[in-house]
Amino acid sequence: MGAPRTCLIFITIQLVSLAYAQEVSKRVPQGFLGMRGKKYFDEEGIEQFYKRKPQFFVGVKGKKSLQDILEAPEEYYKRAPMGFMGMRGKKDLGDSQSTELFPKRDGSLIGKIDYSSKEENADPDFPILNELLLQYLSQLDAPRNTYMQSSESMEPEQSNDLDKRAANFNQFYGVRGKKSINNKRPYDLTFRGKFIGVRGKKDLKNSNAHEIKFLVDQNGPLPKRKAQMGFFGMRGKKWTDEPSLEMDMPN
């Protein structure tokens, strides 16, 4: 009798706690600023969560639709910033010679300068400016110094084939230019110093065995070279006509 009554009381307590828990509304903690996950909203309740752009909005976050720009290009027209001094790109002018599209200021020379040559007829609208330009061009064509011209005419003409003279000895550090070889042989060897040796190889092709033996003999003009201590190889190969030449050579 006691056990069923205890079970009934326990079940009753559980049902009461579940019913009370459903009636209590849960509130978010204080200071809650974000949400983990996403909420599902119907299309009717989206407007209340619309985020407006912040105040003092300067730029655009994202890209603009090309269709909106084509439909209303006046709304998306960008004007140059204050103090704009330059231009990115070039303007296409139909007539490059015309100066009507350029803004003219007070004292500006745009459209007033005659760029034609002296052979062409000057513009009668600007006689003073044309005269000044012709005078300036004549000064450029004329010699700058008549004295230099007269002194140069008195000097005899010199060709570029002459040798160049070096500077002072205490300031000379090398050869400036090239020396003429007209008065010298193309392979003049007189400038060399003491003869030391010949860097090359001996010609054994046209020599016989007696000549080679005389040259490499110990008492001959060219004593035979002995191998170095620890010599294990040879740099290159020697070529001889007779294969038994080494047998005749003294050790």
From Swiss-Prot:
Propeptide boundaries: 22-25, 39-50, 65-163, 180-183, 203-223, 239-251
Protein's UniProt keywords contain Secreted: yes
Tissues of expression: Tachykinin-related peptide 1: Expressed in antennal lobe (AL) and gnathal ganglion (GNG) (at protein level). Expression in AL detected in all animals, in GNG in most animals (at protein level). Not expressed in corpora cardiaca (CC) and corpora allata (CA) (at protein level). Tachykinin-related peptide 2: Expressed in antennal lobe (AL) corpora cardiaca (CC) and corpora allata (CA) with expression detected in few animals (at protein level). Not expressed in gnathal ganglion (GNG) (at protein level).
A cellular component annotation (GO) from this entry: extracellular region
Keyword line: Amidation, Cleavage on pair of basic residues, Neuropeptide, Secreted, Signal
Modified residues (Arginine amide): R36, R176, R199, R235
Signal peptide positions on this chain: 1-21
Lysine amide modification, residue list: K61
Coiled coil: none
GO-annotated biological processes: neuropeptide signaling pathway
Subcellular localization: Secreted
Principal location: secreted
Family, per entry: Belongs to the tachykinin family.
Free-text function comment from the UniProt entry: Tachykinins are active peptides which excite neurons, evoke behavioral responses, are potent vasodilators and secretagogues, and contract (directly or indirectly) many smooth muscles.
Official protein name in the record: Tachykinins
Source lineage: Eukaryota, Metazoa, Ecdysozoa, Arthropoda, Hexapoda
